[in-house]
Curated annotation (Swiss-Prot):
Organism of provenance: Rippkaea orientalis (strain PCC 8801 / RF-1)
Reactions this protein catalyses: L-aspartate(89)-[ribosomal protein uS12]-hydrogen + (sulfur carrier)-SH + AH2 + 2 S-adenosyl-L-methionine = 3-methylsulfanyl-L-aspartate(89)-[ribosomal protein uS12]-hydrogen + (sulfur carrier)-H + 5'-deoxyadenosine + L-methionine + A + S-adenosyl-L-homocysteine + 2 H(+)
Record domain MTTase N-terminal: where: 5-116
Stated name of the protein: Ribosomal protein uS12 methylthiotransferase RimO
Entry's Gene Ontology cellular component terms: cytosol
Major subcellular site: cytoplasm
Domain Radical SAM core: 140-369
Residues binding [4Fe-4S] cluster 2: C154, C158, C161
Cofactor comment: Binds 2 [4Fe-4S] clusters. One cluster is coordinated with 3 cysteines and an exchangeable S-adenosyl-L-methionine.
UniProt keywords, alphabetically: 4Fe-4S, Cytoplasm, Iron, Iron-sulfur, Metal-binding, S-adenosyl-L-methionine, Transferase
Span of domain TRAM: 372-438
């Protein structure tokens, strides 16, 4: 039997998609396939697509068309495959297989069938699979960072969101399964673990009958990983036990990613998030009171159907009042198969874009003030890269999550994928700058200061 084909992957979309990519690569590598980082040289290219909003679909389509024009054999996976399976197979004869969001664990069988001349469609109507610690992973992040999925799918039905249609209802892994994988990652030298799902604060509700994030955090506190970061915390799910677990578990960073989406009760009601409008202020105040050093990231949608200037002004005042550390702003994207697609009045795209730009301008002085407060402090920094031309080190402090927040640019020497003390010397809107301070090298996995 000849050599097995080489396979490359083009990863698009979110961290959840990244984990799917890593599991597919892990399964293929385990089965003896060679993983090639060069798409031009690989026999097959898996394109793990995103379909969350129009912009993401356009990026996925561009990637697919470029590969098709290069006459590559394409395996399409991910959310766009789940969403537009028939259209993709019809429009792209170069697509030799299409794999749904609940079927990526079959990738070895898919490739084998393709090798035998079959054009494969492996898509479950309702995704139900979630990978556990027994499914191999070929990690694509830097050595010191790993994402850890605690649950898949979503039981909520926000009016703008197509995710439940693409990834199914929530299904949680057991605490034991998650902790076992965390230990595996610790053994690989991971310094930062990022917990993800659609709604991390709802973790365990489907499996145990009640949310179990607080218990999970305390168990992860026993694993030798210096930083544990929480993403996708639904604001109304931040209960007192969860806040206490964050405060009392040394390796859990006081960093919360809270996708609030809006502040005005009427818009939140239209978004089908009505309960949130009554608790936004109180939740944020409660977090800051319980965890004064908390770093808060949030995202907002502007231009949602029916959003008036009054609604937008409410959001601007909300951002000014609470002074979030990091803010992301998206313009509304009308997605078919969501209630918001048919809602009226739709906000003109130019007005939505203008509101986005204005809200980002409002946030900028807040962001730079937060960063300038770090000047003079010695903070822990996870060193992830080195500029080969200048020798400058690049990393992140606990204030910064990968890809969405800023970076710390460091003068001095330190090994990659280690956490070292860095004295911050100056700051700009998004990033910090400093120099290594290796005389002060204790307990930096435990605090933000």
């Amino acid at each position: 039997m000849g050599n097995k084909p080489t396979i490359a992957i083009s990863h698009l979309g979110c961290e959840k998609n990244r984990i799917d990519s890593e599991h597919m690569l892990g399964l293929l590598a385990e089965a003896g396939y060679q993983i090639d980082g060069n798409e031009e040289l690989a026999d097959y290219v898996i394109v793990n697509t995103c379909s969350f909003i129009q912009e993401a679909r356009q990026e996925s389509v561009r990637t697919l068309v470029e590969l098709a024009e290069a006459n590559k054999k394409i395996i399409i996976s991910g959310c766009m495959a789940q969403h537009f399976q028939e259209e993709l197979l019809e429009e792209l004869p170069e697509a030799v297989a299409i794999v749904g969001t609940g079927d990526y664990q079959t990738i070895v069988d898919v490739v084998q069938r393709v090798e035998n001349g079959e054009r494969v469609k492996a898509i479950s109507t309702t995704p139900t699979f979630i990978a556990d610690e027994s499914i191999p992973r070929y990690r694509t992040t830097t050595e010191g960072v790993a994402y850890l999925r605690v649950a898949e799918g979503c039981d909520y039905r926000c009016a703008f969101c197509i995710i439940p249609h693409l990834r199914g209802n929530q299904r949680s892994r057991s605490i034991e399964s998650i902790v076992t994988e965390a230990q595996q990652l610790a053994d690989q030298g991971v310094q930062e673990l990022i917990l993800i799902s659609q709604i991390t604060t709802n973790y365990g509700l489907d499996l145990y009958g009640e949310p179990k994030l607080a218990e999970l955090l305390r168990e992860l506190g026993k694993v030798d990983i210096p930083w544990v970061r929480i993403h996708y915390a639904y604001p109304t799910g931040l209960t007192s036990p969860i806040i206490a677990a964050i405060r009392e578990t040394p390796n859990v960073l006081p960093y919360l990613d809270l996708p609030l989406q809006h502040s005005h009760p009427q818009i939140l009601k239209t978004m089908n998030r009505p309960w949130q409008g009554q608790v936004n202020d109180s939740i944020i105040e409660r977090i800051k009171e319980a965890i004064p050093e908390a770093v808060l990231r949030t995202t907002f949608i502007v231009g949602f159907p029916g959003e008036t200037e009054e609604h937008f002004d409410h959001l601007v005042n909300f951002v000014q009042r609470h002074e979030f550390d990091h803010v992301g702003v998206f313009t509304f994207s009308a997605e078919e198969e969501t209630p918001a697609y048919q809602m009226s009045p739709q906000v003109p795209p130019d007005i939505a874009q203008e509101r986005r730009n204005l809200l980002m301008e409002v946030q900028q002085p807040i962001s730079i003030k937060k960063n300038q407060n770090c000047i003079g402090q010695t903070v822990p920094v996870l060193i992830e890269q080195e500029n080969p031309q200048t020798g400058q080190l690049i990393g992140r402090s606990p204030r910064f999550a990968p890809e969405v927040d800023g970076l710390v640019y460091v003068q001095g020497e330190a090994p990659l994928n280690t956490i070292v003390p860095v004295q911050i010397t100056h700051a700009d809107v998004y990033d910090l700058y400093g120099k290594t301070n290796l005389k002060n090298d204790t307990a930096f996995g435990e605090t933000l200061n």
